Amino acid sequence: MSSNGTGLSKTVPAAIAAHDWGWRHASRLAWAVRGLDLAIRPGERVLVLGASGAGKSTLVRALAGVLAPDEGEQEGSLLIDGQPPIAGRGRAGLVLQDPDSQVILQRVGDDIAFGCENLGVPRDEIWRRVHVALDAVGLDVPLETPTNVLSGGQKQRLALAGVIAMQPGLVLLDEPTANLDPTGVIEVRDAVSRSIAATGATLVVIEHRVAVWLPVVDRVIVISPAGVVADGSPDEVLRARGAELAAAGVWVPGFPPPAPLRTSRAASEALVNARDLSVGRDGSAIREGLSFDVSSASTTVTTGPNGSGKTTLALTLGGLLQPIGGELRATSALAAGASLSPIMWRSTELLTRIGTVFQSPEHQFVASTVRAELAVGPRALRLDKAAQSQRVDELLARLRLDALADANPFTLSGGEQRRLSVATALATRPRILVLDEPTFGQDSLTWAELVQLLAELVDAGSSVFAATHDAEFVAVAADFTVDLS
């Protein structure tokens, strides 16, 4: 039976119950979350808030049944419809912070259909659901489109479409709009709202940016590593505890984070010149005719909708993609004896000249602990062990990662992974720092700290080039803008 003309069928909404529940990742001393008590009724729409590292992602992964017993230690109980989540995985659909981690197959249609196939949905019904889900999330591409050509934001919509097609009783969204442009944020939010209204499924959303989801949810739960901090209607929670929550790092409407404190800047000099530059992949141009300069002691941002080429431009500037046409040349001030073409630089030459932070942080992790990850660059520069340790310790403290020094990078929250990826690039002290969505996954406190750190780098003479959808970051940090709209 379809509902509201969406083509989606009614489902049996799931109930959630947690009693003194806790989870500790393997090799960690601290619990990700502990003493959690809550009950979510069938069909409720719940926004889960909390500071970065509060255990939000751990909770939704546990509800999705993807935390295996050998991945950590559990205490208490966490149940869906009276059963452990792992006993009924088809009941929950999960969209993670990193859409790349959920792209499984090579074509868009096949990827959306994958979950339905695993649930044994009849073939004709699968493809009907695939078309409905594509329409619901506004992903206007042919079913045969290769998934590897999609932008980060498009992959986020693809992941959401896969969940919508499964029509689960519980929809779990972990920062579902993190990689979307402002228009895409509203489109996906509305797509979620329509699909939930049509199916009646229970909804649990994790999102740092509260305002986007207030029109959709009917309940807000705030958690910390020690359990539930606040629970009630959105109006009750935000009116009664708005200032307290903002002070803890929750993005509460009306409580903007502080702007960075600036000092006098070092003198500026040109480092990279782009003239009539064309960028793309596999020999095919995405953007053409770009001309701009990147200078020291300045922040340049590139903005534009999903699929406009921001990531491709950032990777090209970072010396990781070959320009399709035009010119991208380093000045002698940056090249310092190396080739004037960044794409020709060896990895050791890039380390001190241009550091790049990818959109998906875990794509650049190579070590088994946070401390070891931070030491990779300094070791490649052949610094002595004392100098390596000093740099690592400074970055651990500066980016609030010292308590996680011995943790596996892949077990960190999305916000913690982002800070680690920035720290790994800073560890070699490059003159240009290229960042793809640098503020993704941050609470308001860590956002302010990260923006302050970048401001201090710029004031000291470094250059920052950022691809971003974050209007607040652009407002307080940008000196120059390359608009790809």
Where are these regions (language model features)?
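Helix-to-loop junction immediately C-terminal to a conserved catalytic motif
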Residues: A64, G318
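Conserved ABC ATPase signature
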Residues: P146-L150, Q154, N408-L412, E416
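Hydrophobic anchor residue at the start of the ABC signature
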Residues: L160, V422
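ABC ATPase C-loop
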Residues: I164, A425-L426
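Catalytic Walker B motif of ABC-type/P-loop ATPase nucleotide-binding domains
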Residues: V171-E175, L433-E437
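Conserved beta-strand-loop-alpha-helix hinge in the C-terminal portion
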Residues: G227-V250, A475, S485
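Conserved ABC ATPase "signature" region
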Residues: E125-P142, A386-L404
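ABC ATPase NBD Q-loop/coupling interface
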Residues: L67, S77-G88, E327-E349
